Amino acid sequence: MTDLTALTLADAKEGLAAKSFTALELTDAHLAAMESARVLNAYVLETPDKARAMAKEADTRIAKGERSNLLGIPLGIKDLFATRDVRLTACSKILDDFKPPYESTITSQLWRDGAVLLGKLNNDEFAMGSSNETSAFGNVINPWRREGSDTALVPGGSSGGSAAAVAAGLCLGATGTDTGGSIRQPAAFTGIVGIKPTYGRCSRWGVVAFASSLDQAGPFARTVRDSAILLRSMAGHDPKDTTSVDRDVPDYEAAIGKSVKGMRIGIPREYRIGGMSSEIEKLWAQGAEWLKAAGAEIVEISLPHTKYALPAYYVVAPAEASSNLARYDGVRYGARVNGKTIAEMYENTRAAGFGPEVRRRIMIGTYVLSAGYYDAYYLRAQKVRTLIKRDFEEVFAKGIDAILTPATPSAAFGIGEKGKADPVEMYLNDIFTVTVNMAGLPGIAVPAGKDAQGLPLALQLIGRPFDEETLFSLGETIEQAAGRFEPKRWW
């Protein structure tokens, strides 16, 4: 039998429908792969008993002739999604051994469509990070290595466990969240596909909040088609989430293979930043050539407020985080460190429970929201955000169908290489991705090449609001031209 963990999600769906193998066999193959890849530290919790029970239920449904979008498909879930009676920590000590009594809307939709839960995936603490080095459960190791080197590399963040697990064949797909690039950047670093849908496309109910006006959940998968299949189950209106948009969910998979002839693709001149590697520049030009060869028109565009996006993001996101994280006080759930007074108990609990990066962002957020600085920082950042959104609206109003940019300024870097002395160095990883969150747009990262050391590099496509289908069509065009990328197994 073929190695079941090497299948794409679409192939696995076909195999299950044809009864070439069972959902239990597919699940067991992934559980075995997870066991042999623990050195990657992708999972913070494995749920083999639950997975096998769900797989058996899927086999029963398949035997009855039932068809469903994800029936029998084993998935990993980022440890930011509430999963009923299954531990949720946000990879922070402050949530300790918390088991939510409810299910997030997105995971309940995945289980409705027949998916199987393999376990919870590692991420940066409270999704704050670009390298998965802030998790209370330790670093995730990227399954990719530089040629001729055994240096451990970061998988990107915050959804590093999700990206590493999909790239290493430890699940057929995974959930992630993206606040400033936390799906697209890890996907780029691990040679897989990651899409951040339009803000409001997927429910945020039951997902631990970082920055509520920026957070959006989305899928990780090995191919563009697999991403489209997963997004169909994840998307949809949810009355429990006031930011969820009531729009029909299209059949995203139908966009795969559609012609891109006549589409107008924008190349923003402001994304040509100083210090960009020649490899990224060449890849960007190559991506434009591939789309041109497929019949698309390449147009140079301007997004003049791009240079303000990163500083504005690092005012807005910490401000919202400081408000959202005020609820973690050790009173009703999670870890508690006692004190002589209730105020001291709050202080002790939060000091011991939050890691240094989370504490840093809470302090920045509290500072920019304080009476003396609210207008100077937070209000000004929100005005900049409006200008960034307007830049995109004006470009799309001129008939641009999508925008092509690099996904990251570099390939994956070594653990401990960045941000130790200066956190801003780490924040610069989000330079190509934050604008998409600030404007609430959809963005997809698609692997498109390798650097001189054999590490994957990706391109990003940015679309009009709720036009993920165009991104899937264009993304698949790049995927067909570039081919697929898989790490050599060393673990």
Curated annotation (Swiss-Prot):
Active site, UniProt feature: K78, S158, S182
Keyword Protein biosynthesis tagged: yes
Entry's Gene Ontology BP terms: translation
Reactions it catalyzes: L-glutamyl-tRNA(Gln) + L-glutamine + ATP + H2O = L-glutaminyl-tRNA(Gln) + L-glutamate + ADP + phosphate + H(+)
Top-rank taxon: Bacteria
One Pfam short name: Amidase
Keywords: ATP-binding, Ligase, Nucleotide-binding, Protein biosynthesis
Class of enzymatic activity (EC top level): ligase
TM ranges: none
Similarity comment: family membership: Belongs to the amidase family. GatA subfamily.
Oligomeric form and interacting partners: Heterotrimer of A, B and C subunits.
Designated name of the protein: Glutamyl-tRNA(Gln) amidotransferase subunit A
